Amino acid sequence: MQEKMKKLMERAAGADWKLNPKWEFTACSTPQQNGLVEVEFATIAGRARAMCNAAHMNDKIRILVANEVLMYSNALGNLVVDKDQSQTHYQLMGLQNPKWAIPGAMRTFGEAGVVTCGKHGKLGDRGIPMVFVGYAENHFHYCYRMWNPASRQITESHDVIWI
């Protein structure tokens, strides 16, 4: 579904684009002219804050997983079912729901799981405890993005045992 751009609004900076749109400028420092966007910023920040609070993440961790929180919360926000048509926002825009949006199979942000990493001897650990922060893009629905608190890195894996 592609539509031709009719109008492009920006601050009075005068950037020169080759798209040949009809230009409309807004004044600087006037949030009343872009109220919907300002409200959306607050909504996204509130979602991210609520998700991190529910996962008991401190401020240092929140900064590290902020991008994951935003991607996950935006995707979840678009899965809201429309009251009148019983369709998700994805379906209303002519798109398919994400592969991971299967009822009953979705994981909770901040959920703990052990990512298996092979054997380390007979008595060694066979996995690393990590935290779920989202779903991997361009993979099967059961491929997860897991955050390792020890190394502070995000790993994609489908070998997860949920705690």
Task: Name what the model sees in each region.
Residues 1-163:
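Anionic group-binding determinants
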